[in-house]
A protein has these predicted regions:
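Short, solvent-exposed helix-loop connector elements
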Residues: 47-55, 171-173, 189-203, 214-226, ...
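A terminal-accessory region detector
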Residues: 224-260
Length: 260
């Protein structure tokens, strides 16, 4: 989801109306209105928030979740689902979401109505990320008739694709998306440039911290290849970093592996 292009709809009023549907205390509603109008500080300059909740506001994440709940989740559950022919599911994280359908006709119908729904509340879909794909247990069979392959999609940094388990059963597998992987590798390269003058103990401590965080998020089943590739990239970057700190080469690859 991306922001709307115009100020046709006052989203602050919709936010208040959504909250009023669950909270009747006028004192709380008054505080919500004051928070929405409080404004934010940007580079030591005050910016008023006449529209939305304001980027950087302490209440912005909560307000955004409430807004998305009523605009999308509640609408999908209470209005859309009863009108569909088959099964449908919705997974939402912040302003990213994936919707699954049993029938293509339901997906096409929902996609058209979703655009109108978002526009009515001052939002719009990110066209580059929004698409209909053939995916699931029977996707390969259906795609083979047209000579195509099942689609893939990226969600929360993972590329999801159709595959099979060791027993030959259908299974959705996930791997680190190429975009996220390349971005993280670039960040490592830039970090190495800043750490050239650091002590080896400090460098390894920092890299271990990064690797631990990376493993905790991306360390899932079927993602071993990308995890191993990222670890190798970090090691290679460290190897080059240590050998560039002086005119004389500090380590060869074997010595480097023994050292770490």
């Amino acid at each position: 989801v991306s922001r709307g292009l115009g100020d046709v709809y006052k989203r602050q009023e919709w936010i208040v109306r959504f909250i009023e549907s669950r909270i009747k205390d006028p004192n709380i509603i008054r505080l919500v209105r004051r928070m929405l109008k409080a404004g934010i500080m940007n580079n030591y300059e005050f910016e008023a928030t006449e529209e939305g909740s304001g980027q950087g506001s302490v209440c912005s994440p909560i307000i955004s979740c409430i807004y998305m709940h009523y605009v999308l989740i509640w609408w999908f559950k209470e209005v859309v689902t009863p009108m569909l022919k088959g099964y449908a599911g919705l997974v939402v994280y912040a302003d990213d979401f994936v919707v699954t359908f049993q029938y293509k006709s339901d997906a096409v119908w929902f996609y058209e109505h979703l655009k109108h729904r978002m526009g009515h509340f001052g939002l719009s879909l990110e066209e580059e990320k929004s698409r209909l794909i053939e995916f699931g247990r029977y996707a390969k069979e259906r795609c083979s008739k047209s000579g195509t392959k099942p689609g893939t999609f990226t969600f929360l940094g993972f590329t999801h694709y159709c595959s099979k388990s060791k027993n030959g059963r259908f299974r959705v597998k996930r791997k680190t998306s190429k975009k996220k992987f390349a971005k993280k590798c670039r960040e490592i390269n830039q970090l190495m440039g800043h750490m050239k003058t650091w002590k080896l103990k400090e460098i390894t401590a920092k890299l271990n911290q990064i690797l631990t965080g990376y493993y905790h998020y991306y360390g899932i089943t079927d993602n071993t290849e990308r995890i191993t590739a990222f670890r190798y990239h970090v090691m290679k970057s460290l190897f080059y970093c240590l050998n560039r700190r002086s005119q004389k080469k500090s380590y060869n690859w074997v010595e480097f592996l023994n050292m770490i």
